[in-house]
Amino acid sequence: MVNTCTYLPLSGKVALVTGGGRGIGAGIALELARRGASVAINYGHSAKSAQEVVEAIQAIGRQAVAIQADLTCVPNIESLIQEVVRHFGRLDIVVSNSGMEKFKPLEETTLEDFNEVFNLNTRAQMFVARYAYDHIQPGGRVILMSSIAAGLGVPGHALYAGSKAAIEGFTRCLAADFGRKGCTVNAIAPAGVKSDMWRENAWRYAPGCDKSSSLEEIETALASGSPLKRCGVPEDIGKVVSFLASPDAEWVNGEFFSPPPCKGPLPGGDLEC
């Protein structure tokens, strides 16, 4: 059964979701569409899954298009946003979701590793906002993507955590910049969301688990620290984004949201809630 929404606060709006072809990005794109938005789905390499998201959106009667662009190349970001405006005629909502995760021992970390992570997780988000500013409609919304990892001390995770920590500073300053156009800028810091990235690295955060642990064991360990006793799914983040993109959030600006109820492993192995 197709899941549709009769409340359409985003009807007539156009959204761009970077990294929207899979995982959290796909969940965000679908939730925006369920609330009436037309959606441009940017992807880097996942053409097949991006097209599947497009088809799922079209199946509920919304418009969607998939656009390939490597956001580690800054000129591609400007071209992407221009293409969205050419295709739909406007731009109202920008969700900067593209990102990558890397674990590497400090003693093995190179400049190439640094550039690889920061070029996508940090620089690209800055320039998505920069070029969105030129085209976004008055009253528009920009939502950046951080991570709860920015506030945790996980071995071998300094590059990822640092690249996401910068987003909080971006958010507060960009909120002031975009305020001149009547637009808001907020950020989300997810954790424990079941996606392809989660499947690869969740064992590193799960108390009592290691690389040999099954996904069921990892999920049980992580969910046990949540008052809701479950891990998040991409649609959970999509619903938070949809709220921030809606008229109800017009007085929410420069804020940093961490939807999951727990903050991760403490030195003793317990989860901080």
Curated annotation (Swiss-Prot):
Enzyme Commission number(s) of this protein: 1.1.-.-
UniProtKB keywords: Endosome, NADP, Oxidoreductase
Protein's organism: Aspergillus fumigatus (strain ATCC MYA-4609 / CBS 101355 / FGSC A1100 / Af293) (Neosartorya fumigata)
Residues that coordinate or bind NADP(+): 24, 70, 97, 130, 160, 164, 193, 195
Subcellular location per the Swiss-Prot or TrEMBL entry: Endosome
One GO term of the biological process aspect: melanin biosynthetic process
GO CC list: endosome
Name listed for the protein in its UniProt record: Hydroxynaphthalene reductase arp2
Regulation of its function: Tricyclazole and pyroquilon inhibit arp2 hydroxynaphtalene reductase activity.
Family: Belongs to the short-chain dehydrogenases/reductases (SDR) family.
Positions annotated as active site in the UniProt record: 146-147, 160, 164
Phenotype reported upon loss of the gene: Results in brownish conidial phenotype. Results in an altered conidial surface with masked surface rodlet layer, leaky cell wall allowing the deposition of proteins on the cell surface and exposing the otherwise-masked cell wall polysaccharides at the surface.
Function noted in UniProt: Hydroxynaphthalene reductase; part of the gene cluster that mediates the biosynthesis of dihydroxynaphthalene (DHN)-melanin, a bluish-green pigment and a structural component of the conidial wall. The first step of the pathway is the production of the heptaketide naphtopyrone YWA1 by the polyketide synthase alb1 though condensation of acetyl-CoA with malonyl-CoA. The naphtopyrone YWA1 is then converted to the pentaketide 1,3,6,8-tetrahydroxynaphthalene (1,3,6,8-THN) by the heptaketide hydrolyase ayg1 though chain-length shortening.
Any matching Pfam family: adh_short_C2
Entry-linked InterPro entries: NAD(P)-bd_dom_sf, Sc_DH/Rdtase_CS, SDR_fam
